[in-house]
């Protein structure tokens, strides 16, 4: 853990004790958009416990985003796009948010649809298979990070040191982060995700923003939104089923192809290979990024 005697001003935003509801029309707004920001205490990566919670949060985000993206495969959905995220608000608070672009003639239906997909998770929880995939992807990410450590983009290093200075986040590096992940991930359960997901439902500490093109005349009111929300809570929803087909993209074993021509370009240290099937391959080993540095202030 990084320790410091630095003192910083407290920036905790008091609890709203209500839903702050905003409806805005703008001639430059091209599509109808709803955003629901739920205020939470900021998760600071000062302790191992918080690192575990950050994994849990990120797994929730990733799984829900995949679910929302899957629902968009149905062309009859009233949504154009849907998303879930978290963002910094102050040094002490952050937003847990979700939102969607709504089809122009189906705004209320689109809000109902979005809220129902989130309610589906509240009622049925996450799937063990979903959690397993997230854990595997996380381990793969760190394994790749270790392999590419020498060519890591400098802006990510600068961002990490910045968080260490401003938020007291510890700095560890990919190898140590990999060890921590291997230690923590087996302890994370579906119940952890189900409980953490409730942070996206702060009914008395949130901002609901609806942005509409100026041409939209049927502007939804706060009362109408609350009524939709109450109706959705009464739905009896089944467990999520992805609209993506769970099958291999390539089912057949692909045959190889012989190299029929090779050529070397010494001036640029590149080899050209032409294959029997017509494919050209250019191979250029490089260490160009190993000593590069980028900085932005």
Language model: regions and residue ranges:
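A structural supersecondary motif
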Residues: 37, 61-102, 160-163
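Acidic/polar loop patches that form or flank catalytic/metal-binding clefts of enzymes
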Residues: 2-6, 67-81, 123-130
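Hydrophobic, mid-to-C-terminal alpha-helical segments
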Residues: 150-162
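Juxtamembrane/interface motifs at transmembrane-helix termini
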Residues: 149-153, 214-217
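Proteolytic maturation boundary segments
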Residues: 1-50, 54-55, 61, 65-69, ...
């Amino acid at each position: 853990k990084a320790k410091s005697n630095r003192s910083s001003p407290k920036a905790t935003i008091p609890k709203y004790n209500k839903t702050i509801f905003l409806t805005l029309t703008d001639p430059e707004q091209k599509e109808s958009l709803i955003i629901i920001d739920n205020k939470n205490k900021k998760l600071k990566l000062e302790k191992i416990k918080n690192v575990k919670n950050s994994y849990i949060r990120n797994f929730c985000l990733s799984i829900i985003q995949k679910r929302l993206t899957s629902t968009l495969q149905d062309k009859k959905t009233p949504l154009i796009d849907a998303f879930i995220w978290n963002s910094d608000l102050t040094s002490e608070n952050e937003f847990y948010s979700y939102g969607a672009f709504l089809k122009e003639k189906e705004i209320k239906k689109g809000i109902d649809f979005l809220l129902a997909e989130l309610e589906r998770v509240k009622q049925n929880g996450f799937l063990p298979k979903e959690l397993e995939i997230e854990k595997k992807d996380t381990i793969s990410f760190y394994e790749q990070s270790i392999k590419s450590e020498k060519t890591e983009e400098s802006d990510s290093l600068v961002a990490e040191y910045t968080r260490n200075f401003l938020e007291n986040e510890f700095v560890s590096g990919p190898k140590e982060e990999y060890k921590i992940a291997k230690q923590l991930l087996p302890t994370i359960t579906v119940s952890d995700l189900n409980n953490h997901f409730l942070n996206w439902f702060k009914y008395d500490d949130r901002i609901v923003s609806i942005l509409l093109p100026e041409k939209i005349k049927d502007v939804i009111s706060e009362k109408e939104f609350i009524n939709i929300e109450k109706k959705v809570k009464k739905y009896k929803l089944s467990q999520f089923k992805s609209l993506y087909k769970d099958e291999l993209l390539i089912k057949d074993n692909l045959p190889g192809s012989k190299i029929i021509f090779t050529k070397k370009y010494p001036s640029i240290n590149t080899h050209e290979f032409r294959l029997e099937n017509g494919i050209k391959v250019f191979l250029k080993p490089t260490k160009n990024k190993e000593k590069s540095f980028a900085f932005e202030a």
